[in-house]
Amino acid sequence: MSRNSYIQQSSDIQAAGGLVPMVIEQSARGERAYDIYSRLLKERVIFLVGPVEDYMANLVVAQLLFLEAENPDKDIHLYINSPGGSVTAGMSIYDTMQFIKPDVSTICIGQACSMGAFLLAAGAKGKRHCLPNSRVMIHQPLGGFQGQATDIEIHAQEILNIKARLNELLAYHTGQDLETIKRDTERDNFMSASRAAEYGLIDSVYDKRQLAS
């Protein structure tokens, strides 16, 4: 399988034996085999699955940019099932989502925690969704550093700066006031899909796909 087709399968799919389903597409030129993720990418579907880290973030960013180049006026659908992860990796995805022209619709399947929840909320307004049994969790950023006392102080201040910035952005995307966000992210704050909708992290809970008439 090609490097580009590895999308977000990483450790979860490797644990299942590394097997990725293949689909056969018929065309006038004959048959062509795709791994399932590459085939869904043709439908403008991207998967963000597993811990958010640099390699996975680069793949997501590359796919967002590719789909924008293909059609800058058609929505992109980002499916999220993530426990969170690196803030810097997550922010590279966030900034790209805001930068590109197409709306990015976000859909939580399973869980969207920490940076996963942040990216879920960062989707286009009116196009952020959860499936009914998904869970969402927000909290303050985690960090740890060893070294000289002065360096520890520098890193501690940087974590506080990151926390403040994430709170500001979360307040913007949810419509909550900043003080509410500060209070609610002080500890791990788990929400059901319906509670996430009430809070403003998403716009609706999907029970069934709405088919075009």
Swiss-Prot record:
One GO cellular component term: endopeptidase Clp complex
UniProt lineage: Bacteria, Pseudomonadati, Pseudomonadota, Gammaproteobacteria, Pseudomonadales
Keywords tagged on the record: Cytoplasm, Hydrolase, Protease, Serine protease
One BP term from GO: protein quality control for misfolded or incompletely synthesized proteins
InterPro entries: ClpP, ClpP/crotonase-like_dom_sf, ClpP/TepA, ClpP_His_AS, ClpP_Ser_AS
UniProt cross-references to CDD domains, sorted A to Z: S14_ClpP_2
Enzyme superclass (EC): hydrolase
Protein name in the entry: ATP-dependent Clp protease proteolytic subunit
Gene Ontology MF term list: ATP-dependent peptidase activity; ATPase binding; serine-type endopeptidase activity
